[in-house]
Structure formats: structure tokens, C-alpha cells
Amino acid sequence: MNKILFYLFVYGVVNSAAYDLLKAPNYFEEFVHRFNKDYGSEVEKLRRFKIFQHNLNEIINKNQNDSAKYEINKFSDLSKDETIAKYTGLSLPIQTQNFCKVIVLDQPPGKGPLEFDWRRLNKVTSVKNQGMCGACWAFATLASLESQFAIKHNQLINLSEQQMIDCDFVDAGCNGGLLHTAFEAIIKMGGVQLESDYPYEADNNNCRMNSNKFLVQVKDCYRYITVYEEKLKDLLRLVGPIPMAIDAADIVNYKQGIIKYCFNSGLNHAVLLVGYGVENNIPYWTFKNTWGTDWGEDGFFRVQQNINACGMRNELASTAVIY
């Protein structure tokens, strides 16, 4: 088999939803080639295979029971704990108080459209990849500000997550942070630069921000305690995409479709709510993630509405108003 045919074969098998657990060794070798894995020793490779096999079994079970589809992907040789530790970054707060105004979403929702998506209005920037840096909090907050800027100025921009990692001393850089405290930090810093002026490094570094290059400034911030999940529809249409906290453990191997089974064993990841809709009579929310476009639905994922999917109904959703 020539090299081109080999990789076409690998791509087709690894991306198939009809997995067979008995073929786990074959899938694993294909996975190793596709993602250029080098484990350093046979002992470590065997350890990774056992984790891979466990994840494959879970993928098969989910594909049999959920309306969404799951696949072998770049995280499939990592345990859930490893993935959460390396690729998320939401820090659970000791206390949630800061100077962002608290709003309780405890009123029934108003009447609105059955479907709405800020992407269709070209107000959502491209999906980014946080890599092995626990800065989801920075990506989600800045993604919302990028959308705020697009709504206000009809221009898509990319803001600097690295500035947040290096210069936000309220949060902890690649070691984690929170959404409302990130907005607080931006207010204290005075603004945020463009990513092109302060490129992403996926690591903690010294603060090098230049206030003369601030493009976006925050004047107010809000934190929401979600009682009625449906009320998020009104809020989304009113204020723009919303950074939210979730438990990402059940979305790691997600490929496509509407997730019905996503539980909350502890909030650990920040994502951006960008829309909602209905498919096959199932109402869903659409989120933008920060794991690259090679994950999920081109970097986005959908969950069923009104089941507190992934623990999304909590008190950590936050937004900000820009000048």
C-alpha cells in the first residue's frame, strides 16, 4: 500500500463511527500514525493503548445511546483527567464576588424566534486552539469581546489571549482562571491588544502589553445566575455571544450532532454560547470551543436544551460591555 492510500485508509477508519472494540490494536496503530505519536518506550505505549482502549469502549457505548456521534480523535490516548488538566482551565472559585454586577435569570423567557445564531450574522470570529495551556477562560472572554466589537463596528478582529495570560494578575494564566474575573482584569488593565500585536505562545510569560495598542476597552461587566435555562435565549439575542462554564468531560471525543448525555461532575471549561435551534424536533444550544477546527463540528458543538447539559446552568456565565 503506497503512502497516500495508507493515509486515506487511516483517515477513513479512524473517523468511522462504526467501531469494533476487537479492532482496538489496529485503530491504535492508525491513531499513532495519524497524530504522529511518539511515546518514548514500549511501556508507555502499552499504557497509552490501555487508555485508548478504554476511551474506544466509551465512544462505542455513546454512539449506541446518544443522538450525537463520537470518534477517535487527538485526545483518545489521554485519560479524561489528563485532558481536563491540559486542555481546559476553568478554576472553581473559592468565592465568586467581584465588581461585575450580578443578574439572576429567574424570569420566564419572552417570545422569540425558534432559531438564532450569531454566526449567520458574521459576528463570531474563527475557532482558535488553546493547546496545552489552561486558558479557556481567556479564550472565551475574548471571543465574546470580539463578537461585541463585530456587533458594534461590523468588523471581525482577533484579540490577544497571551496578554490575558501574562498580564491578568487576578487569574492564573495557563494554570486557570474565571470569566467574570477576566473581565475585571481587563477593566483594571485598561484594554486588550490585537493578537497580531501580542501573539499566542500557550505558556506563561512576562507581561509585555502596550496600552498604546489597546483596541477594545471594557466599561461594565455582568455575571449571571441561571435559573431558567430558556432565558438564555433572550440574553443571547440581546447582548451577543455569552461565555459560559461547563464540565467538558463528556465532550472530549465528540464529532457531531446534538449531545443528550453530558453530565456535570464539576465545572472545568469555558466555552462561548453563540446560538440555538431545533433539529429533528430536538432543541439545542450551539457553543464555540477552543480545541481547533479539527474537533467537533468545525470547532463547535451542540447540546440539548433544558437538561442542564454539561452543567451549563450555573452562576459563572458572564458578559461585558465595550466602549
From Swiss-Prot:
<keyword id="KW-1015">Disulfide bond</keyword>
<dbReference type="InterPro" id="IPR025660">
    <property type="entry name" value="Pept_his_AS"/>
</dbReference>
<feature type="disulfide bond">
    <location>
        <begin position="262"/>
        <end position="310"/>
    </location>
</feature>
<dbReference type="GO" id="GO:0006508">
    <property type="term" value="P:proteolysis"/>
</dbReference>
<keyword id="KW-0788">Thiol protease</keyword>
<feature type="active site">
    <location>
        <position position="136"/>
    </location>
</feature>
<feature type="disulfide bond">
    <location>
        <begin position="167"/>
        <end position="207"/>
    </location>
</feature>
<keyword id="KW-0865">Zymogen</keyword>
<dbReference type="Pfam" id="PF00112">
    <property type="entry name" value="Peptidase_C1"/>
</dbReference>
<dbReference type="InterPro" id="IPR025661">
    <property type="entry name" value="Pept_asp_AS"/>
</dbReference>
<dbReference type="InterPro" id="IPR000668">
    <property type="entry name" value="Peptidase_C1A_C"/>
</dbReference>
<comment type="subunit">
    <text>Interacts with chitinase/CHIA; this interaction maintains VCATH in the host endoplasmic reticulum.</text>
</comment>
<feature type="active site">
    <location>
        <position position="269"/>
    </location>
</feature>
<feature type="disulfide bond">
    <location>
        <begin position="133"/>
        <end position="174"/>
    </location>
</feature>
<dbReference type="InterPro" id="IPR000169">
    <property type="entry name" value="Pept_cys_AS"/>
</dbReference>
<feature type="propeptide" description="Activation peptide">
    <location>
        <begin position="17"/>
        <end position="112"/>
    </location>
</feature>
<keyword id="KW-0325">Glycoprotein</keyword>
<dbReference type="GO" id="GO:0008234">
    <property type="term" value="F:cysteine-type peptidase activity"/>
</dbReference>
<keyword id="KW-0378">Hydrolase</keyword>
<comment type="function">
    <text>Cysteine protease that plays an essential role in host liquefaction to facilitate horizontal transmission of the virus. Accumulates within infected cells as an inactive proenzyme (proV-CATH), which is activated by proteolytic cleavage upon cell death.</text>
</comment>
<feature type="active site">
    <location>
        <position position="289"/>
    </location>
</feature>
<keyword id="KW-0645">Protease</keyword>
<keyword id="KW-1038">Host endoplasmic reticulum</keyword>
<feature type="signal peptide">
    <location>
        <begin position="1"/>
        <end position="16"/>
    </location>
</feature>
<dbReference type="InterPro" id="IPR013201">
    <property type="entry name" value="Prot_inhib_I29"/>
</dbReference>
<keyword id="KW-0732">Signal</keyword>
<feature type="glycosylation site" description="N-linked (GlcNAc...) asparagine; by host">
    <location>
        <position position="158"/>
    </location>
</feature>
<dbReference type="InterPro" id="IPR013128">
    <property type="entry name" value="Peptidase_C1A"/>
</dbReference>
<dbReference type="InterPro" id="IPR038765">
    <property type="entry name" value="Papain-like_cys_pep_sf"/>
</dbReference>
<protein>
    <recommendedName>
        <fullName>Viral cathepsin</fullName>
        <ecNumber>3.4.22.50</ecNumber>
    </recommendedName>
</protein>
<dbReference type="InterPro" id="IPR039417">
    <property type="entry name" value="Peptidase_C1A_papain-like"/>
</dbReference>
<comment type="similarity">
    <text>Belongs to the peptidase C1 family.</text>
</comment>
<dbReference type="Pfam" id="PF08246">
    <property type="entry name" value="Inhibitor_I29"/>
</dbReference>
<dbReference type="GO" id="GO:0044165">
    <property type="term" value="C:host cell endoplasmic reticulum"/>
</dbReference>
